[in-house]
Amino acid sequence: MEHLERCAWVLRGTLVRSAVRKYLPWALAASMLAGSLLKELSPLPESYLSNKRNVLNVYFVKVAWAWTFCLLLPFIALTNYHLTGKAGLVLRRLSTLLVGTAIWYVCTAIFSNIEHYTGSCYQSPALEGERKEHQSKQQCHGEGGFWHGFDISGHSFLLTFCALMIVEEMAVLHEVKTDRNHCLHAAITTLVVALGFLTFIWVWMFLCTAVYFHNLSQKVFGTLFGLLGWYGTYGCWYLKSFSPGLPPQSSSLNLKQDTYKK
């Protein structure tokens, strides 16, 4: 438990900082552009991470929203209940996960439709011999063909959105104080470590996507959708009263923020 607490302490000192929430979106956008330029101008040699079957891609990135959802669910519930003691407020804050699920579902559906309506089936990856009889990606692949359309990077979208959402929710740790004897201490500490490492995986795999996969425009649109999903919720809607709201803050901190705004 002592090692876990040390990890949690380090993660609190990094991911929970307001500077991280402020600059991470810009860092992701900049690294996506830099990685994409590197891919176009001086491609890196193939490696384990450039293989789509690598462990991180198969068991984490492919189900990134499931990991994010399953770890944020108990984290939001425990930290918000610890601070407020109000079940209604906890349920309201948990609805952020429903909103996130809706954003994930709608965006991936949009990407799939764009790839469908802009694509065609070919006999080879070199786009030779168009097979007009196959009108869908599933049918094309089923017949051994290769579908080529505008494939917006789902990884760039989802990894951006998940990383930013986790960092936003971990801001509550500024207010959460538990000692070793507290009944929630072990659970919250474990979740902090798990979410911290998950965030680093998302950022690392986002960088791998930038330097190994998709073209620049596909990654630009994917990252843009992720940033819009984050900013539209945490930057706009969640500031309103008719929303799931932001992570709870102490009255003293709110007073300081109100004074600063004035």
Swiss-Prot record:
Keywords of the record: Endoplasmic reticulum, Hydrolase, Lipid metabolism, Membrane, Transmembrane, Transmembrane helix
Keyword Transmembrane helix annotated: yes
Entry-linked InterPro entries: FIT, FITM1/2
GO terms, biological process: cytoskeleton organization; fat cell differentiation; fatty-acyl-CoA catabolic process; intracellular triglyceride homeostasis; lipid droplet formation; lipid droplet organization; lipid homeostasis; lipid storage
The protein's name in its UniProt record: Acyl-coenzyme A diphosphatase FITM2
Recorded topology in the membrane: Multi-pass membrane protein
Family that this chain belongs to: Belongs to the FIT family. FIT2 subfamily.
Enzyme Commission no: 3.6.1.-
Cellular component annotations (GO), alphabetically ordered: endoplasmic reticulum membrane
Reaction catalysed by this enzyme: an acyl-CoA + H2O = an acyl-4'-phosphopantetheine + adenosine 3',5'-bisphosphate + 2 H(+); (9Z)-octadecenoyl-CoA + H2O = S-(9Z-octadecenoyl)-4'-phosphopantetheine + adenosine 3',5'-bisphosphate + 2 H(+); (5Z,8Z,11Z,14Z)-eicosatetraenoyl-CoA + H2O = S-(5Z,8Z,11Z,14Z-eicosatetraenoyl)-4'-phosphopantetheine + adenosine 3',5'-bisphosphate + 2 H(+); hexadecanoyl-CoA + H2O = S-hexadecanoyl-4'-phosphopantetheine + adenosine 3',5'-bisphosphate + 2 H(+)
MF annotations from Gene Ontology: coenzyme A diphosphatase activity; diacylglycerol binding; triglyceride binding
Organism of this sequence: Bos taurus (Bovine)
